[in-house]
From Swiss-Prot:
Organism: Staphylococcus epidermidis (strain ATCC 12228 / FDA PCI 1200)
Span of the annotated motif DEEQ box: 748-751
PROSITE patterns xrefs: HELICASE_ATP_BIND_1, HELICASE_CTER
InterPro entries recorded: CarD-like/TRCF_RID, CarD-like/TRCF_RID_sf, DEAD/DEAH_box_helicase_dom, Helicase_ATP-bd, Helicase_C-like, Mfd, P-loop_NTPase, RecG/Mfd
GO biological process terms held by the UniProt record: regulation of DNA-templated transcription; transcription-coupled nucleotide-excision repair, DNA damage recognition
Job of this protein: Couples transcription and DNA repair by recognizing RNA polymerase (RNAP) stalled at DNA lesions. Mediates ATP-dependent release of RNAP and its truncated transcript from the DNA, and recruitment of nucleotide excision repair machinery to the damaged site.
Protein name, UniProt field: Transcription-repair-coupling factor
C-alpha cells in the first residue's frame, strides 16, 4: 500500500512543485483532507529523511494525524511529544505512558536522530531541561566499561529514578552487592553485574520472576522524568523560590499570606528529601538558569510543517488566557508565586520567524504570515456506502470506467479476502498483489488503514477505507504496551509486608512481624515471627512457611487476632468447613441435575450466523473468541447450558451474548434478555436493534418506558412466537408472560436481583439455556476449585488500543475543577461529578452552577424515587444535561459514551475497588477519558487514607493500586458467585484458606483424591548455620520468596535453578546459604529414598527410613555402594524401620550427602531372586 500510493503521489506535478520549495520558502498547501494531508507529509518525509517538525493545535489532533502517518512511516521514525492542553497536568501524578513518549522524543532530538516529530502547540511552548544537561544524562553502559558507582547512582536519582529494595515498577533501581537493577522508562528492565568497578555483564530480566533472560552487550538508560534535577538545580531553585516568595508576599491580600507561607514551606520540606520530580515540576520556571524549549532541541535544518495555522493561533490565545487566569487565581489564593510558570509564550512566533514553514490548511483563508507560494490540491471526500451494495457497485463501476486506480484499505488479511469476493460477485475485477504495475481502471484490495478515504481526481486515484464501506472506525495505531493479565495483577498482592495480617492453618489469624534469625542450640536459623492476641508471639521455622498465608478479605476490614492455644480458631474453622461442604453439596447436586436433564440441542452455525458475525466492525479479542466457542459448544449439546461469563466493564461481553442470542433465533427459538435496571434494558435494546438491523429479527422491550398498549402487544407477540428477542427488567419474570418457545435466557448481573427473582431464574434454568453476565471478576483460585462444577468463561483482555484513562490525583482546588469542567464541555462532552453526601448534594450543584453558569447540571442519588432516578439518568444519557452530580449510584452498569471526565471529591474516603470501578465509567469511546481524584487540601490524612491515595496515584500505571483493586473485586466476585452469606466466612479465615477448603470439599464430594506424595514431610535436624543472612538478601519479601521456592524443590534440576537465581539476583552466596542449599539437596535425595528423619545426635547422624522403604531397599547394593564409608556407617532395624547411623568426621556433611544418595540409588535396584 505504502509504495503504491507513494508512487502515484511522487509522480504528480503538484507534489513535485511542492517538493522543490518545501523547507526553502514559506508555502501554503490547501485543499487536502486530513488523511490525504498525512499521506503528502509522510511522502515528503520519506523522500528527504531529515528531521521534520509537525505542529498541531492540540494533542487530540496530534494523535489523529500520527495514526494516519504510521500507515506510511515506520513507527521507529515517528515521534510525538504528548502534552495535555491542561494546567492541571503540572499539578498531578504524570502518566508514565505520556512521560515515556516525551522522553523518547527529547532523547532522539538530543542525539540528532532523523524522524517525523509531531508536537501539539502546548508541548512546543513548555520550559524544558537545558539541552546540554539533558545530553549529559543520556547514559550508555557497555560490558567491560569502568564506572564510578556512586556517581552513576547519583545520576540515576537526578534522572528521576527511585531507589527500592526490589525493582518492580518503571523508574526504580536497586543495588544489592555488586548487582544494579534498573527499570528504565523505555525498554526492558536490566541487571548490571559489576566486578569491582567494571561492568562484568548486562542482562535483561523479568520483574515478575526477577530472573535474568538474555545477555546484552550494551544498554541505553534514558531518564525516568522529562526534567533533570541535580544538586546545582536544587540550589538554584531554592534561591529563586526564596526571592519569588519574598516578592509575592507583600503583593497579595493579608488574609492569604499564611497560605502562601504554607505553600512555600511545603516546597522547602520536599527539597530536603529533594528529588520528588512530580512535585518539583511545578517550579520549572525557577529551576534552571537558562531553560530550553523544544525548538532548542531541533537541528537548524529541520523542516517545519504547521497544521491549520489559524486554529493554532486560536488555541494559543485561549491557552494564554487560561494559563494567566489560572496562575492569577493560584497567586491570589496563596498557592503560587509571581514568576511561577510553565511556558515561554513567544516560542511559537520565534519558530515561524527563524524557519521556512509549510502551512497546511483545508480551506484557503487569510493568514497573518508572509507566503512565497500557494499550492492548491483538489481533493474530494469519498462516498459513504455504509453497506448499501447497489450504490457501492455503481460507484466502483464508475471509477473503473473512468480509468481510476482504486485502493481499498482493510484491517486484516481475512477482510481482504472477504472484500475481494464481495467485489468479484459484483463483477468488479480486483488485484491483490500490490507489487505488480497497476494500470488505471483496476481495484486493489490490500491490508492497511487510514482515518478516512479520499479522492485525488487529477491523479485518478481514490483511496477507500472500511469507514466508507461499512461505517467502521480505523483502529491501527502505535501498538500500546502489553496489558497485564488478571493473574499477574493479582499475583503480587500475596507479597507479605511487615504488619500484614496472616492466617496460620493451625493457629489462626495473626500479624506478620518479619523474618528473624534466631540462635537455637548453637545454630542460626531463620524464623517467621508472628504476633497473636495480647503478647503472644509465634516463631514458625521457614521450612514450615506453607502453613502461613497472607490474610486477604474484603477491603479495609481488620480481622480480630486469635489467641494462641485458644479454641476460637478451631470453632471458626469448623463453621467454615461445614459451610463449604454445604456449598459443595449444592454445587454437585445442581451439576448432576443439569447433566441428567435434557434441553434443546442447537444445530451448527448457519450462513446467516457467519454473515451476522462478519458485520461486527471490530476484531474480537482472543478471550472473546474463546468464550463464544465455549457458549456455542454448550448450546450444541443436549443438556441445558448454565454458563457464567465474566469480564471487566467494556471488555465486550455484550457482543458475545448478542451472538448467542442470534444463534438461538436462527434455530427458531426465543430469547429473553434480563437486566437489573430500566436504563440498562434501554441500552441493551438499542444495541440489539443496531446489531440486527439487517436481519429479520423482531426485538421488543418490556420496561417502564413502554406504554401499557406496547407491553400488551409484546406479550401477545411472545405468546404467538412473533417476537424473537425480548429485553426487560424483572417484569420478564412475571407469571403473566408466556413464551411460545423460549430457548435462551441471558441474565446481566444476576447478583443485583432480589431473592424472589433469583428463585424464578433458578426454575427457568432447569430446561432453558442460561447465560449469565457479570462485570465483577471471578478469582482464579475459585475458578480452579469450581472446574467441572460450574461453567465459567472469562474475558481478561481489554479491546485493543482502548485509550488508558488519564488519572490525576490532586488537592481539591476550585481552579482545577473549573478547568476540568470547561475542558470537557468545550469538546461537547459530559462530566460525572461524584459527591457522596446526599444531605448537601444540592448545595454542591449550586456551587458548580455558579462556577459554570451556562452548564445544565442534574443530580442523582439513591434516596430519589426509582422513577425520578431513571428519568434523570436517561436525560443525562440523551445529553440533556452536561454535568451529573451524583453519589456512588453510578458505580455499576450505566454506559454513557459521551461522558469522559470523572471528578471525585474526597477520593481518600473511597475504597480502591470502588475507585477502580468508578473510573471504568469514563474513557469508553474513542476519546481519551480523564479521572480527577481530589483530596482535601491541608487535611491531615490517616495512615490508611494516605496509603490509599498513594496507591491511587499508581493507577496511572498498572501498579499495585490496580492489584489491590483487583483483589477486592475478586473477593466481591467470590461472594456474588457463592452467595452473600459466604462473605462472612471468607472474612473469618481469609480468602486463600477459604478457596483451599472449598476446593478440597468439592474434590472429595466428586471422589477426586488429592495428589499427595507418599513420603511424609521429612524432618532434617542438623547443627548447621543454614539461613539467608540479611547482608546477603536485604528484602524480606525476597527472602520469603526464596524460602518458598526451596520448600518446593523436589529434584536436583529445581535446586540448580534456585542456585542460579540466587547468583543471578544477589551475586555469589556466603557459607550460611551454601549450608542451606546442602540441607535442601539432602532432603531431595531423602524424599526419593523414603527417609523419614535425619537427626544430628552430636557425635553421629541418625537416619530412619519408613517401613515401606525398609521393605523396598536392596541391602546388598547399599553395602556395595557405601564401602568408602567403612566403619563410620552402621545399619540396624527397629520397629520395622531401617536405622542408619553415620559417625561424624571432619567431612561429615559430604559423607551424609553421599550416604543419602546411595540409599536413593539402592531403592531403584530390586533384589535378584
Amino acid at each position: 500500500m505504502k509504495s503504491m500510493i507513494a508512487n502515484y503521489i511522487s509522480e504528480d506535478n503538484r507534489f513535485q512543485e511542492l517538493d522543490e520549495v518545501f523547507g526553502q520558502e514559506n508555502i501554503l498547501v490547501t485543499g487536502l483532507s486530513p488523511s490525504a494531508k498525512a499521506t503528502i507529509i509522510a511522502e515528503k518525509y520519506l523522500k528527504d529523511h531529515k528531521q521534520m517538525l509537525l505542529v498541531t493545535n492540540n494533542l487530540y489532533q496530534a494523535d489523529k494525524i500520527e495514526t494516519d502517518i504510521l500507515q506510511y512511516v515506520d513507527d521507529s521514525e515517528v515521534y510525538k511529544y504528548p502534552v495535555q492542553d491542561i494546567m492541571t497536568e503540572e499539578f498531578s501524578t504524570q502518566s508514565p505512558q505520556l512521560m515515556s513518549e516525551r522522553v523518547r522524543t527529547l532523547t532522539a532530538l538530543a542525539q540528532g536522530e532523523k524522524g517525523l516529530f509531531i508536537v501539539p502547540l502546548n508541548g512546543f511552548k513548555k520550559w524544558l531541561t537545558p539541552v546540554d544537561l539533558w545530553k549529559d544524562h543520556q547514559m550508555t553502559l557497555k560490558v567491560g566499561q569502568d564506572i564510578d558507582v556512586d556517581a552513576f547512582l547519583n545520576k540515576l536519582v537526578n534522572m528521576g529514578y527511585r531507589r527500592e529494595s526490589v525493582v518492580s515498577h518503571i523508574g526504580e533501581f536497586s543495588l544489592r552487592g555488586g548487582i544494579i537493577d534498573i527499570y528504565p522508562l523505555i525498554g526492558t528492565p536490566v541487571r548490571i553485574e559489576l566486578f569491582d568497578t567494571e561492568v562484568d555483564s548486562i542482562r535483561d530480566f523479568d520483574v515478575e520472576t526477577q530472573r535474568s533472560n538474555d545477555n546484552i552487550n550494551q544498554v541505553e538508560i534514558t531518564t525516568a522524568s522529562d526534567y533533570i534535577i541535580t544538586d546545582e538545580v536544587i540550589q538554584h531553585l531554592q534561591n529563586e523560590l526564596k526571592k519569588a516568595y519574598e516578592y509575592t508576599r507583600p503583593k497579595i491580600e493579608k488574609s492569604v499570606r499564611n497560605d502562601l507561607k504554607e505553600t512555600y514551606e511545603s516546597f522547602k520540606l520536599f527539597e530536603s528529601t529533594f528529588f520528588d520530580h512530580q512535585l518539583l515540576r511545578r517550579l520549572v520556571s525557577f529551576m534552571y538558569e537558562k531553560p530550553s524549549t523544544l525548538i532548542d532541541y531541533f537541528q537548524k535544518n529541520a523542516i517545519i510543517v504547521v497544521d491549520e495555522f489559524n486554529r493554532i493561533k486560536e488555541t494559543e490565545e485561549t491557552l494564554t488566557t487560561e494559563v494567566e487566569d489560572f496562575m492569577s487565581n493560584l497567586i491570589e489564593s496563596g498557592n503560587g508565586f509571581i514568576g511561577q510558570g510553565f511556558m515561554k509564550y513567544e516560542s511559537f512566533d520565534a519558530l515561524l520567524e527563524q524557519h521556512a514553514v509549510a502551512y497546511f490548511t483545508l480551506f484557503t483563508s487569510s493568514m497573518q504570515v508572509p507566503l512565497q507560494h500557494i499550492i492548491k490540491f483538489s481533493c474530494k471526500p469519498v462516498q459513504q456506502f455504509y453497506g448499501q451494495y447497489d450504490i457501492m457497485r455503481s460507484e466502483f463501476q464508475r471509477y473503473v470506467h473512468q480509468d481510476y486506480t482504486v485502493v481499498v484499505l482493510v484491517e486484516t488479511e481475512t477482510k481482504v479476502e472477504r472484500i475481494q469476493s464481495m467485489l468479484n460477485e459484483m463483477h468488479i475485477p480486483t488485484v491483490s498483489n500490490i507489487h505488480e504495475d497497476i494500470d488505471g481502471g483496476q481495484v486493489v484490495v490490500t491490508e492497511g488503514s487510514l482515518s478516512e478515504g479520499f479522492e485525488l481526481p487529477y491523479m485518478q486515484l481514490v483511496v477507500i477505507t472500511e469507514r466508507e464501506l461499512f461505517k467502521t472506525r480505523q483502529k491501527k495505531q502505535r501498538k500500546r504496551t502489553k496489558t497485564i493479565s488478571n493473574a499477574e495483577k493479582i499475583k503480587s498482592y500475596q507479597d507479605l509486608n511487615v504488619g500484614d495480617y496472616i492466617v496460620h492453618v493451625h493457629h489462626g489469624v495473626g500479624r506478620y512481624l518479619g523474618v528473624e534469625t534466631l540462635e537455637v542450640g548453637d545454630t542460626h536459623r531463620d524464623y517467621i515471627k508472628l504476633q497473636y492476641k495480647g503478647t503472644d508471639q509465634l516463631f514458625v521455622p521457614v521450612d514450615q512457611m506453607d502453613q502461613v498465608q497472607k490474610y486477604v478479605a474484603s477491603e479495609d476490614k481488620s480481622p480480630r487476632l486469635n489467641k494462641l492455644g485458644g479454641t476460637e480458631w478451631k470453632k471458626t474453622k469448623a463453621k467454615v468447613q461445614q459451610s463449604v461442604e454445604d456449598i459443595a453439596d449444592e454445587l454437585i447436586d445442581l451439576y448432576k441435575e443439569r447433566e441428567m436433564s435434557v434441553g434443546y440441542q442447537y444445530g451448527q452455525d448457519t450462513a446467516e450466523q457467519s454473515a451476522f458475525e462478519h458485520d461486527f466492525p471490530y476484531e474480537l479479542t482472543p478471550d472473546q473468541s474463546k468464550s463464544i466457542d465455549e457458549i456455542k459448544g454448550d448450546m450444541e449439546r443436549a443438556r441445558p447450558m448454565d454458563r457464567l461469563l465474566c469480564g471487566d466493564v467494556g471488555y465486550g461481553k455484550t457482543e458475545v451474548a448478542v451472538r448467542a442470542a442470534f444463534k438461538a433465533v436462527m434455530d427458531g427459538k426465543q430469547v429473553a434478555f434480563l437486566v437489573p435496571t430500566t436504563i440498562l434494558a434501554q441500552q441493551h435494546y438499542e444495541t440489539l436493534l443496531e446489531r440486527m438491523q439487517d436481519f429479520p429479527v423482531e426485538i421488543q422491550l418490556v420496561s417502564r418506558f413502554r406504554t401499557a398498549k406496547e407491553i400488551r402487544e409484546t406479550k401477545e407477540g411472545l405468546k404467538s412466537g412473533y417476537v424473537d428477542i425480548v429485553v426487560g427488567t424483572h417484569k420478564l419474570l412475571g407469571k403473566d408472560i408466556q413464551y411460545k418457545d423460549l430457548g435462551l435466557l441471558i441474565v446481566d448481573e444476576e447478583q443485583r436481583f432480589g431473592v424472589r427473582h433469583k428463585e424464578r431464574i433458578k426454575t427457568l434454568k432447569k430446561n432453558v439455556d442460561v447465560l449469565t453476565l457479570t462485570a465483577t471478576p471471578i478469582p482464579r483460585t475459585l475458578h480452579m476449585s469450581m472446574l467441572g462444577v460450574r461453567d465459567l468463561s472469562v474475558i481478561e483482555t481489554p479491546p485493543e488500543n482502548r485509550f488508558p484513562v488519564q488519572t490525576y490525583v490532586l488537592e481539591q482546588n476550585t481552579n482545577f475543577i473549573k478547568e476540568a469542567l470547561e475542558r470537557e464541555l468545550s469538546r461537547d462532552g459530559q462530566v460525572f461529578y461524584l459527591y457522596n453526601k446526599v444531605q448537601s448534594i444540592y448545595e454542591k450543584r449550586e456551587q458548580l452552577q455558579r462556577l459554570m453558569p451556562d452548564a445544565n447540571i442534574a443530580v442523582a442519588h439513591g434516596q430519589m424515587t426509582e422513577r425520578d432516578l431513571e428519568e434523570t439518568m436517561l436525560s443525562f444519557i440523551n445529553h440533556e444535561y452536561d454535568i451529573l452530580v451524583t453519589t456512588t449510584i453510578i458505580e455499576t452498569g450505566v454506559d454513557v459514551p459521551n461522558a469522559n471526565t470523572l471528578i471525585i471529591e474526597e477520593a481518600d474516603r473511597f475504597g480502591l475497588s470502588q475507585l477502580y470501578q468508578l473510573r471504568g465509567r469514563v474513557g469508553r469511546s474513542s476519546r481519551i477519558g480523564y479521572a480527577y481524584f481530589l483530596h482535601p487540601a491541608n487535611k491531615v490524612l490517616n495512615e490508611t487514607a494516605e496509603e490509599r491515595l498513594q496507591t491511587i496515584k499508581e493507577f496511572t500505571e498498572l501498579g499495585s493500586g490496580f492489584k489491590i483493586a483487583m483483589r477486592d473485586l475478586n473477593i466481591r466476585g467470590a461472594g456474588n458467585l457463592l452467595g452473600k452469606q459466604q462473605h462472612g466466612f471468607i472474612d473469618s479465615v481469609g480468602f486463600d484458606l477459604y478457596s483451599q477448603m472449598l476446593e478440597e470439599a468439592v474434590n472429595e464430594k466428586r471422589g477426586i483424591k488429592e495428589e499427595s506424595p507418599d513420603a511424609p514431610d521429612i524432618e532434617v535436624e542438623l547443627h548447621l548455620d543454614a539461613y539467608l543472612p540479611a547482608e546477603y538478601i536485604q528484602s524480606e519479601q525476597a527472602k520469603i520468596e526464596i524460602y518458598k521456592k526451596l520448600r518446593k524443590v523436589e529434584t536436583e534440576e529445581q535446586l540448580f535453578d534456585v542456585k542460579d537465581e540466587l547468583i543471578d539476583r544477589f551475586n555469589d552466596y556466603p557459607i550460611e546459604v551454601e549450608r542451606l542449599l546442602d540441607i535442601v539437596e539432602i532432603k531431595v535425595h531423602a524424599l526419593h529414598a523414603g527417609v523419614e528423619l535425619i537427626k544430628d545426635k552430636g557425635k553421629s547422624i541418625q537416619i530412619i527410613l519408613s517401613p515401606k522403604a525398609t521393605e523396598d531397599i536392596n541391602g546388598e547394593e547399599l553395602f556395595k555402594q557405601t564401602q568408602p564409608l567403612g566403619r563410620a556407617m552402621k545399619v540396624g532395624v527397629q520397629n520395622n524401620a531401617m536405622n542408619v547411623t553415620l559417625t561424624k568426621s571432619k567431612q561429615w556433611l559430604d559423607s551424609l550427602k553421599f550416604l543419602v544418595r546411595c540409599i536413593e540409588e539402592s531403592m531403584a535396584i530390586k533384589d535378584e531372586d
